[in-house]
Structures are given as C-alpha cells and as structure tokens.
Amino acid sequence: MAVVLEAKERPDKKHSTLRRIRLQGNIPGILYGKNIDNQMIFVSGAALEKTIREGGRHSLMTLKIGEKDYSVLLREIQRDPLRGNILHADFQAVDMSTEVDIDVDVRLIGEAAGEKDGGVLQQNLHQLTIRVLPANIPPSIDIDISHLQIGDTVTVGDINTGGKYEIIDDPSEVIATILPPQQEEEIHSGEQQEPGHPDAEEGRETTPES
C-alpha cells in the first residue's frame, strides 16, 4: 500500500514565497504528469523525510491535494549542499497501468564465503534501472552473496526478477565480485648480503678497498 503524503497548493514561485514555506518547515515542490496540469505545491518537510526513510527514495506514494489523490513517484529532490536538508521536490503523477523506468537501489545480503577466506567484496553497481508497473516497484533489489567464493562475480544477468520487472542495464555488467586477498609485501628479498658490505647504489661512486 502506497504511503499517503498530504500537499497543499502554493500561490506562486517567488523567492519570498519559497523562503516563507521553508521557514515554516515545509518543502516547495511541483506535481506534473501526463494529462494533468502542472501544480505548484508544498509538503511537510518532516513527513517527506519520514516517507523517504521508511519507504525508500523511489517508492510509490499517494499525494493528496485537497479532495484529489494522485499516484506519484518522487522523481527529483534538491538538497542543501551544506546542511543536507531538502530544498525542493518534483513529483510525477503516474498511470498505474503503464510501466515506468526507475532507478532502484541494489542491496547485497549476507557475507560471502570468499570474505571469510580473506577475500575482499567489491560492489560496482549500487543502483539498477528497471521497467516496471508502479504497483510492483520493489523497495530494493536484494542479492544473496553468501555463496560467492574468491574470484566469483554477480552480473545483472544473474538476477531473478520473478517476471515482475525488466532490468534495463546490460546483463553483462558486474554488480559485485570477491577479490583475492591482498598479498603482504615481502620485506626481504631472497638474496643474502654480507653484513657491513652493502651493494653499491646505482649511479653512486664507490671506492674500492685497498
């Protein structure tokens, strides 16, 4: 069930209006989509942050504006580069019977067998683009890596979608791999040197013993 987020219309996009909205703890935004007029809105900052935290950045939401409900996706958010708080949000109204392209987070589950043997997990992809009906958008794409040995990889093509969505990314792209353990650098070489008689350094003059 989609999370319900209440929104109100805002009169304009003047800087003074936007500033007042933010000072009141709200976030200005816009609602757009096929067959609807763009609407300038604002939502509660705390409510939006909670929705993202609990449902995920790309989850389906119900945006309630007055007596009307819209099924929406949060397509873009702008954050303050220093404080990290949300400054603006773009909501796209979607048709529940039409597939959408959306980025979904990749989550690796478990500890790889190769890690227990000293291998190093390297994750190359943290998001995948999928084509899916809005009601079937997963909160994340979970991949069990517990069986991976050193040298093993997981590619996009290895993911079982269960027929619920299509992955747009190239099937050959590597999502994660288990690298061999880093070899400890040898401190001593195999050659032995007589004490008190270091080898001559290249480019340095030496005086033969008399």
UniProtKB/Swiss-Prot annotation:
Q: Which UniProt keywords apply?
A: Ribonucleoprotein, Ribosomal protein, RNA-binding, rRNA-binding
Among the Pfam families in the record, one is Ribosomal_TL5_C
Naming one, the record's GO cellular component terms include: cytosolic large ribosomal subunit
In the record, biological process GO terms are:
translation
The keyword Calcium is assigned to this record: no
Annotated spans, Disordered = 179-210
Domain of life of the organism encoding this protein: Bacteria
Q: Which SUPFAM superfamilies match?
A: Ribosomal protein L25-like
List, as start-end ranges, the regions of compositional bias called Basic and acidic residues. 185-210
A single GO molecular function term of this UniProt record: 5S rRNA binding
Q: How does it assemble?
A: Part of the 50S ribosomal subunit; part of the 5S rRNA/L5/L18/L25 subcomplex. Contacts the 5S rRNA. Binds to the 5S rRNA independently of L5 and L18.
The function of this protein is: This is one of the proteins that binds to the 5S RNA in the ribosome where it forms part of the central protuberance.
Family of the protein in this entry? Belongs to the bacterial ribosomal protein bL25 family. CTC subfamily.
Supply the name of the protein: Large ribosomal subunit protein bL25
Organism per entry:
Geobacillus sp. (strain WCH70)
